[in-house]
Each structure stands twice: as C-alpha cells, then as structure tokens.
Amino acid sequence: MNGRLTGCIKVGTKQTTKMVEQDKATLVYVAQDADSRLASRIVQLCKQHDVKVEFVDTMRSLGKLCGIDVGTATAVVVEE
C-alpha cells in the first residue's frame, strides 16, 4: 500500500472500537506488528459487525498512511 488513506479516517484503537461498535466503520486497518491480543480483539469485533479488515505490515507504515508521524495499531474508515 502506498500513499495516504483517503476519506474520513480515525486513528487508534479507542476510536476504531468506538466507530465499529456504533456501526459507522466501513473498513478497519490493523498493523501486523500490533499487540496480538489487541489485534485479535479488533478483528473479532469487526467480524461481529461485518466490517472488512485489511492488514498493513507495520504500525509505522499505518501511521504514515494516515498522515501522522507516529505509528498506530489500528485505523478506521468511517461513513461521512
């Protein structure tokens, strides 16, 4: 994946969880090097809410895709 994510993006596990639980998420990105318990919880939540999950190599690269200078374990694309 190159460039930046487009659309309305929320960054971080708390925001991702909140958007999925409120059925506002259309797509969730999870970094493959994120804490496995955290990643498993997010993936399971997405399955329960029928939200597609895509994996990104590293937290750093996911952060870059989101336009921030730090890594992030998860990011979510939300309905506008």
Q: Positions of the model-derived regions?
A:
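Ribosome large-subunit tunnel/peptidyl-transferase-proximal elements
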Residues: 1-24, 35-37
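Alpha-helical elements of the RecA-like P-loop NTPase motor core of helicases
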Residues: 18, 40, 64
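Signal for well-folded cores of large energy- and translation-related assemblies
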Residues: 21-24, 47, 67
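General secondary-structure edge motif
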Residues: 25-26, 42
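Alpha-helical transmembrane segments of helical membrane proteins, especially in multi-pass transport
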Residues: 29-30
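Feature captures the catalytic cores and cofactor-binding loops of soluble hydro-lyases/lyases
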Residues: 34-60
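C-terminal structural segments of small proteins and small subunits
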Residues: 51-80
